[in-house]
Amino acid sequence: MSIKGVPTDAARPMADLIVAGEHTVASRGLARQQVADLTLFAFAAGESVSEERYPADTVYVCLEGTLAVTRGGEQALVPAGSCLRVREGVGHAVSGVGGSAVKFLQVNA
């Protein structure tokens, strides 16, 4: 698997690798292979993604802010530095908590 967009010269905070403009959702693919997809996301305050389903397990790693993952009407909070797995095929939506901006890494494998 080839990973791109991650510094090799010096360590940097992962959250600094992506920025969302006002009223936007930004994404940056780091790797896309048959075995796994790694994508950085930055949601501006108040932005969200409605329910989606993936054919593989999804791991969310929150980098800044608090990510809300809603599955079957139940919301799980993922604060910065924490992670949560959603099993394959389970519909879920993601957003920042309380209308705040959030940055996270999404891993599908």
Task: Place the predicted regions along the sequence by residue.
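A short, N-terminal "cap"/entry segment at the start of jelly-roll beta-barrel domains
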Residues: 1-35
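Structural motif
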Residues: 66-68, 75, 91, 101
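Ligand-binding loop in jelly-roll beta-barrel domains
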Residues: 88-109
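Short acidic-glycine-tyrosine-enriched beta hairpin
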Residues: 73-89
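Short, conserved beta-strand element in jelly-roll/cupin
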Residues: 42-44, 53-69
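Conserved short histidine dyad/triad with adjacent acidic residue
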Residues: 23-24, 37-54, 88
